[in-house]
Swiss-Prot record:
Name the UniProt record assigns to this protein: Adenylyl-sulfate kinase
Biological processes annotated in GO: hydrogen sulfide biosynthetic process; sulfate assimilation
Encoding gene per record: cysC
Coiled-coil stretches noted in the UniProt entry, renumbered to this chain: none
Family recorded in the similarity comment: Belongs to the APS kinase family.
Annotated active site: 113 (phosphoserine intermediate)
Assigned keywords, A-Z: ATP-binding, Kinase, Nucleotide-binding, Phosphoprotein, Transferase
SUPFAM superfamilies registered for this protein in UniProt: P-loop containing nucleoside triphosphate hydrolases
EC number(s) on file: 2.7.1.25
Lineage: Bacteria, Pseudomonadati, Pseudomonadota, Gammaproteobacteria, Vibrionales
GO molecular function, one term: adenylylsulfate kinase activity
Pathway linked to the protein: Sulfur metabolism; hydrogen sulfide biosynthesis; sulfite from sulfate: step 2/3
């Protein structure tokens, strides 16, 4: 199933609200940001993002975690896994993350998002410095060895076509804001690396 290309109407104009992004952020005592977790299936994107959200919640910050599987149950349930649908999936999530950041939230997005162009598309939606690319850096060998959902086994058997890392390319980030050595450190250590970066960027205090 393929989504139709949206058509822009010149009669539709942006309505500026009185309560703006800065006001919402000040209420929450935090700086809006979109942390975009990217990496191969099984690298630990959702695990690290979830653990980070737990820590941020404990510290009193306002967050929302967007998970690749979860959004396909609703917002992107009409999309398949063709290249066109995968691009549309990321475009929709990028727009949603932008709205959530506008609400003053710290957004954690965990998606394979294999192509640099699609990640750049999301980056370009946001003000400079608000998009934080987090590369959950684990090798194909490590991810396939974990295979928590049995997807690599199915892909190797030809049951899942166009599976990222097997018969579909994953383009690793060239210069991510955060590079997490997910094959070497514990989840707790990776969370600390993220927290330190957020403090340096004054997203949190």
């Amino acid at each position: 199933m393929t989504a139709e290309t949206p058509v822009k109407d010149e009669n539709i104009v942006w309505h500026q609200h009185t309560v703006d992004k800065q006001f919402r952020a000040e209420l929450k005592k935090q700086k809006p940001a979109v942390l975009w977790f990217t990496g191969l299936s099984g690298a630990g994107k959702s695990t690290v993002a979830g653990a980070l959200e737990n820590r941020l919640a404990e510290l009193g910050y306002h967050t929302y975690l967007l998970d690749g599987d979860n959004v396909r149950h609703g917002l992107c349930s009409d999309l398949g896994f063709s290249e066109q649908d995968r691009r549309e999936n990321i475009r929709r999530i990028g727009e949603l993350a932008k709205l959530m950041a506008d609400a003053g939230l710290i957004v954690l997005s965990a998606f394979i998002s294999p192509h640099r162009a699609e990640r750049q598309l999301v980056r370009d939606l946001l003000p400079e410095g608000e998009f934080i690319e987090v590369f959950v850096n684990a090798s194909l060998e490590v991810c396939e060895g974990r295979d928590p959902k049995g997807l690599y086994k199915k892909a190797r058997a030809g049951e899942i076509p166009n599976f990222t890392g097997i018969d579909s390319e994953y383009q690793a980030p060239i210069n991510p804001e955060i590079d997490l050595p997910a094959g070497e450190k514990s989840v707790e250590e990776l969370v600390e690396l993220c927290l330190n970066e957020l403090k340096q960027r004054r997203v949190i205090s």
